[in-house]
Amino acid sequence: MKRSMKFIAAFLLLPCVATAQVTDSIQQYGRGISFDMKESTVAGAMATSEQISHKTSIDPSNSLYGLIPGLQVLQNGGYAWDDGATLYIRGVGTSNSSTPLILVDGFEREISSLTVQEIESVTVLKDAASLALYGIRGANGVVYIKTKRGAVHAPVINFGYEFNFSTPNRLPDFVDGYTYAQALNEGMKNDGLSPRYSQRELDAFRDQTYPEFYPNVDWWDEALRDHAYGNNVNFSISGGGERVQYYAQLNYLNNLGIYQPTEENDGYSTQLKYSKMNIRTNLDIKVSNTTKVKLNLLGVFSENNRPQSDISTVFGALYQVPSGAFPIKTSQNIWGGTTVYSNNPIANIAGSGYLRTQGRTLYADMSINQDLSSLLPGLSATVNVGYDSYGFYQEGNVRTFADQSAVKGWDGAEDTYTKLREESDYTFDTSLKTMNSHFNFSAQTNYDRSWGEHKLNATLLYSMDKKIGQGQNNKYAFMDVVAQGHYTYKNRYILDFALSGSASSVLEPGNRWGIFPSIGAGWILSEEDWLKSDNLNLLKLRASYGIAGRADFDANLYKYYFGSGNSYYFKDTPTSQSGMKEYRIAVDGLTYEKSHKLNVGVDLMAWNKLSLTVDGYYDHRTDILVDGSGAISSVFGMTVPMRNDGIINSYGVDVAANWTDHIGDFTYQIGGQFSFARNEIIEMNEEYRPYDYLKRTGHSVGQIFGYEVEGIYQSQEEIDQRDVKQYLSDVRPGDLKFKDQNGDKRIDQYDQVALGYNETCPEIYYGFNVGAEYKGLGFTAYFQGAANYSKILDTKSVYRPLVSNNTISQYYWDNRWSESNPNGTLPRLTTQGSDNNYNTNSSWVADASFLKLRTLEVYYQLPEKWLKNIAFVKGIKIFGRGHDLFCVDGIDIADPESIGVAHPTMRQYAFGFNLKF
């Protein structure tokens, strides 16, 4: 089923478009700056703790699917400690990294270190009015996470427990041993070679008369169980008095993966195991009437366990080894193998030893705020200090497992067993994998004053960031000086302005600083006398323009590097001499990317039920670091350095809406969000291309190029009679037939055109949600989808069978072209590969649009009257949840977000309860 999800998106979003963002009263800019959202000119959007709490995922990024307009969240692998999503803000705006800046309580930190339960809100900053504050690090946007804090009230204790289990999504289906043998013979015949297996060997596969020599092993069934499971326990307490408020949390979670067998070793397991404990304390201390201190501490302790063979090795073997290659073990109790296949999947799991990684992370920060109103009314000063330290240690036993081939002796000959590899002794090893630290210091003065119909808030800030990583050339520093002002007149006319000077250590001395201005304006029409109405809660127009930067390059690109050179011969009698040579040419005039951002938006709230936000934007990105080979002659003689010549334009729209209402005891809510983000390469130093349709310039970043397929050659006669000749490789019946784009009667590299869309980030991204509750019984459902999104189907064995000794999927076997199946839609089988088939072409470029049910929660909150007789208990909630329950798409046999050789994504179920005391 191939159709674009954009039509589904448009249909579903007519009545409801995204979660309301303007209903929350305070918007966080970061930098110690926050304003009432009613009086903000910023294109910011926010998800609250209540919204993200419906999925207590191991990595909080997986709780953000489809929640925040302008934030694209794409799913990655499915195993516990690498389950984080990829985040983009307003799509891709550069040919380099588009990763946004992640801030936790104002400090750059990893979202994966947090738990869902400790997050108060997640705010996405998207336009220049907010991003100019971050100067040289703001161009890709900012995700600002605020953690929970205490308040003045009696202690409130929350305890929650969740049991979860998950099942793999869309595992590939590979053929049995008999079918594989048939496929291999067919492929070799198509290549003009003799068949690999005789008829009696085929019969042995089919009848399983000699399973040791002609096996039929379902490697996926033997290596993986059908579920993973885990626990999540959370305890928190908050409260405080006038002097001290506190929030403290203890969270523990674990997860056991899908490998089997994993317990047959002496004293250790090779299961995919993960556990993590978070301990957080947030304190607000009123030292005096004019002095306040905030102290935040977070300790994260994690451990993961796996076989010595890493996940890519295990799944690489599962995707490659045929069912009929060898038995799991021979009759001599030695792991099976052959000279071709030395990667027994089960031996990789159970026989290679184990590797355990332990992580220790400390996040500590403190801020001191001093009220200076005695000097000047409205004046205050704040100092912030943060220090992070994290290290990862590894230990493990490693060994080489023995394997053995088994060959059947026919016609009275003896069976042959050949030892391919001897088993080694265990070697125990420990090592420090990573040790990093991060120091941040900032000092700022704030002025907040109202007089008459005027309000002014101004900030002057200095900030310094320093990161020290393990190894050479792994130190980075940033420095910022920021001036910001926010002015409001008559509660309806708003002006924001900012000017920041920002520097990065990765740039050349003397060229490290940049200036980043911005201006924003807003008009609250609903405050005008001629528009005031009880039904119109808010109507605001706003616009902003400014510049933000990006300079997260590798260190020392501005330096020349020299290394040892090859020998050179001197004099009449050649004498070899070694020496030094230029290894890397410096980037001349290395500078930061400059993102010129324009945003226009409108916010609407009506009837105390409806909220709507619409933003349109344009981003002109210049000085992008790109390959310089298109601008410098190839006679240069060595690798051409990169240059800041790239230009990319991006534009789009973000829409968010929500409707909340009640009828008696029945409350309901419906909402969603829709984002469209497109980019266009204006300049990339592209090499000369003889035809316009070959040019990458003018297309989006990551646009797929390849051959356009017109069909499949059915016979040698058709090949001979066609006046267009394919010069990619020898053409045989069953090969793909490509379109001649330039009319020169030949198919070569000049016949590639743009196919589909990019495979990095979808242009259309949307989500919608619906929820209802009646007397404590309720449900919430979150859907998320994407469109204008393509993927290249090139997974080995699934779409690239037999070549390089791969197995073959049932899908390919059923749909291949053959003499007996001329209507097959996939190319002929081959063991040698073919540039006519296994290249990038329209047959392998799939529409990756999808719609997923990300979360479905059903819950019951016990009535308060039931709890009156239970001492100290103020609330009980019981729930059941499902995540990624179904996906509507056109690929069917694979998750459109996870194409390739990897751990499968997982469908998750959870049951639990929350207690409030």
Model-derived segments and their meaning:
Residues 1-279, 293, 689-690, 742:
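Short, small/polar-rich motifs associated with maturation and membrane association
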Residues 107-150, 170-174, 214-234, 253-294, ...:
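Outer-membrane beta-barrel proteins
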Residues 158-211, 309-310, 662-760:
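Conserved small-residue
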Residues 196, 321, 325-330, 347, ...:
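Extracytoplasmic gating/loop element in the C-terminal half of outer-membrane beta-barrel translocons
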Residues 282-291, 297-301, 306-311, 316-319, ...:
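Extracellular/periplasmic, surface-exposed regions of secreted and cell-surface proteins
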Residues 759-792:
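Glycine-rich, aromatic-lined ligand/substrate-binding cores of catalytic
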